[in-house]
Amino acid sequence: MSLNYLLILCFYSVILEIIARKPEIDSLKPIINVEQNESFQLMCGILKGTKPIKFEWFKNGRKIVDQSGISIDLKPTSSILFFDNILVQHSGNYSCHASNSDGSDQSSTILQIKGSFLF
């Protein structure tokens, strides 16, 4: 008795297509009111987009860098602008800009600081 074996080899071809997507920012509120002399944070989060994503913050069109009382925390899909003690002079138009190799997005808010006045 002879045994015949049929060996069938199946090869599967998998094609993985990576589609890069530009970042899409979760929009900031148009206007934010904050009391003076409080700590405050402004968060910029990504709804979708291919990593790595580069974040930048701007105040009135000028890039913000870490400075005394203001710091920037960067994560893979978000960035937080921290104010240790927010003052009236921090009022202005703030923008978060997110970019990757496929494009960019930005969102802006007007930050209004309520000061205490002594008469």
Please give the residue ranges for each predicted region.
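Immunoglobulin-superfamily
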Residues: 2-6, 10-119
